[in-house]
Amino acid sequence: MSKTHLTEQKFSDFALHPKVVEALEKKGFHNCTPIQALALPLTLAGRDVAGQAQTGTGKTMAFLTSTFHCLLSHPAIADRKVNQPRALIMAPTRELAVQIHADAEPLAEATGLKLGLAYGGDGYDKQLKVLESGVDILIGTTGRLIDYAKQNHINLGAIQVVVLDEADRMYDLGFIKDIRWLFRRMPPANQRLNMLFSATLSYRVRELAFEQMNNAEYIEVEPEQKTGHRIKEELFYPSNEEKMRLLQTLIEEEWPDRAIIFANTKHRCEEIWGHLAADGHRVGLLTGDVAQKKRLRILDEFTRGDLDILVATDVAARGLHIPAVTHVFNYDLPDDCEDYVHRIGRTGRAGANGHSISLACEEYALNLPAIETYIGHSIPVSKYNPDALMTDLPKPLRLTRPRTGNGPRRTGAPRNRRRSG
């Protein structure tokens, strides 16, 4: 993290449990980010919190620190059973649940608290085996949590801490009934610590969320600016026929170290992947129907640097901690204004600079006015020379080939720059 991303407030300044402070410092966390500095005084005093901050500002560590401190500082309820977790952290996607679990592991190792993970798609028996041995903190998606609860594999009657991460997406995806079902099986709101964190939190969502909280305190960081000030935003207006060639030309120009390309449909993502893989790029594909194990492998390869480009639907836009993403390309402008914020928030994280490039084609240009109204500013427009777009492009690959494009990255200098002056 850069110094500009941190505050003067140190974790050791708070009355945190010593084991929590030790674990944080061992991982190199000394100074708080703004959202952590705002949230911790409240949660340590037992106050419920609804926190809004840009992605990459430390929301996950804010609620994990609060959760571990609370459980270490307060005894479990009397007669707690082995199938009763003490804390429940709910996430909208499998990938985010896995990421939270990974972030929590160093704290669990240092404190002795046991973690459990519950998400759909695969691993049912493996996850259940961990739960049957007893866990203190259960992290998961609502569908699998309800499945385990209905079969009495877990009982929520001993919950002391509840977290909703990416709360707006939880509601947007229609999980409101699931969330309420789970809350009804917990102790009353005033008998537990409740936390909500998200990059965007509408008044509608805030009102719904507060039904399940105890006079929560609303905190936010940089509320006047929905897109990070370290992200350079840029917009092009290509025709549908020139759109793919423009994308490939921009990639040649920018030569990004690590880029995510977002499109609105699975079919479009597969099309983009095919063109880039054929052109020799180390590119991965992440859509909703990719098997869970393969999705996690692709994310790991992208994070390690084995892949340079990730083509994705919005499944990858929320909550994932992928470091050092230098560029985000919106091949399609999203239909949901909030998705624009979450997409470009993959870059410019943790105090770094980032670059977002959006293509307003004939099909999705009508989404632009609502996006610009939502973010509160116009996206700067750049022009290009149609005659200078790349033409020497190979035939795109089909998905009968490996999705992750494991061939070597093309070497040599980028082709000549093709933007008009």
UniProtKB/Swiss-Prot annotation:
Gene Ontology terms, MF aspect: ATP binding; ATP hydrolysis activity; RNA binding; RNA helicase activity
Location(s) in or outside the cell: Cytoplasm
Motif (Q motif): 9-37
Residue segments, region Disordered: 392-421
Catalytic activity: ATP + H2O = ADP + phosphate + H(+)
EC number(s) on file: 3.6.4.13
Highest taxon, organism lineage: Bacteria
InterPro entries referenced in this protein's UniProt entry, alphabetically: DEAD/DEAH_box_helicase_dom, DEAD_box_RNA_helicase, Helicase_ATP-bd, Helicase_C-like, P-loop_NTPase, RNA-helicase_DEAD-box_CS, RNA_helicase_ATP-dep_RhlB, RNA_helicase_DEAD_Q_motif
Compositionally biased region (Low complexity): 402-414
The keyword Protein biosynthesis belongs to this UniProt entry's keyword annotation: no
Ranges where the Helicase ATP-binding domain occurs: 40-219
Motif DEAD box, residue numbers: 165-168
GO biological process annotation, one example: RNA catabolic process
Helicase C-terminal domain residues: 245-390
GO CC field: cytosol
Binding locations of ATP: A53, Q54, T55, G56, T57, G58, K59, T60
Keywords: ATP-binding, Cytoplasm, Helicase, Hydrolase, Nucleotide-binding, RNA-binding
Task of the protein: DEAD-box RNA helicase involved in RNA degradation. Has RNA-dependent ATPase activity and unwinds double-stranded RNA.
Family: Belongs to the DEAD box helicase family. RhlB subfamily.
Oligomeric and partner information: Component of the RNA degradosome, which is a multiprotein complex involved in RNA processing and mRNA degradation.
Protein name as catalogued: ATP-dependent RNA helicase RhlB
Naturally occurring in which organism (per UniProt): Escherichia coli O157:H7
